[in-house]
Curated annotation (Swiss-Prot):
Residues 37-192 form the SIS domain. Keywords: Carbohydrate metabolism, Cytoplasm, Isomerase, Metal-binding, Zinc. It is found in: Cytoplasm. The reaction produces a racemic mixture of D-glycero-alpha-D-manno-heptose 7-phosphate and D-glycero-beta-D-manno-heptose 7-phosphate. The lineage of its organism: Bacteria, Pseudomonadati, Pseudomonadota, Gammaproteobacteria, Aeromonadales. It comes from Aeromonas hydrophila subsp. hydrophila (strain ATCC 7966 / DSM 30187 / BCRC 13018 / CCUG 14551 / JCM 1027 / KCTC 2358 / NCIMB 9240 / NCTC 8049). Substrate binds at N52, G53, G54, E65, N93, D94, S119, T120, S121, S124, Q172. One of its GO terms (molecular function) is D-sedoheptulose 7-phosphate isomerase activity. This is Phosphoheptose isomerase. SUPFAM superfamilies: SIS domain. Homotetramer. The gene is gmhA. It catalyses: 2 D-sedoheptulose 7-phosphate = D-glycero-alpha-D-manno-heptose 7-phosphate + D-glycero-beta-D-manno-heptose 7-phosphate. Zn(2+) binds at H61, E65, Q172, H180. Its EC number is 5.3.1.28.
Amino acid sequence: MYQELIRNELTEAASVLQAFLADEQNLKDIEAAAKLLADSFKQEGKVLSCGNGGSHCDAMHFAEELTGRYRENRPGYAGIAISDPSHLSCVSNDFGYDYVFSRYVEAVGRRGDVLLGISTSGNSGNILKAIEAAHAKGMKVIALTGKDGGKMAGLADVEIRVPHFGYADRIQEVHIKVIHILIQLVEKEMAK
């Protein structure tokens, strides 16, 4: 009854991934982002990650893979998802939701740290403010975006963009693949 829908969904997902894979610059950007992360960890830096909705979950997943493990046992790496409910509710109430990530970056970000900002549209106001705060602190910025990169286009040290203009879930599906590859590459870089 739903097999055609299922096939169409999987076909579209494969098509979006294939289009992303066909652009060699995406592979170079993933490698550059992984090296940027590993360089920070080698200097005892940390990565702060943030996103909204499903991208928030991806930011948490990324941090968890760093502090925990991916495929193999190894030392934990300093990854913090900006996701503490008391912080989010305090800043939302006192300053507004656009500041939930930037206030955290201002509080704990340091020169040599990295911000990973995830936004499928590239237009999330709170991610844009977090990027601004990260730059002010001397941090490096990696952005996972979609569509045309939105307002985040050109603001990061490394932007990894999924140029899909349909629903956000297709962009998120590629983002999670990128996150897993970043972890794998960081592990290889740290083992050198």
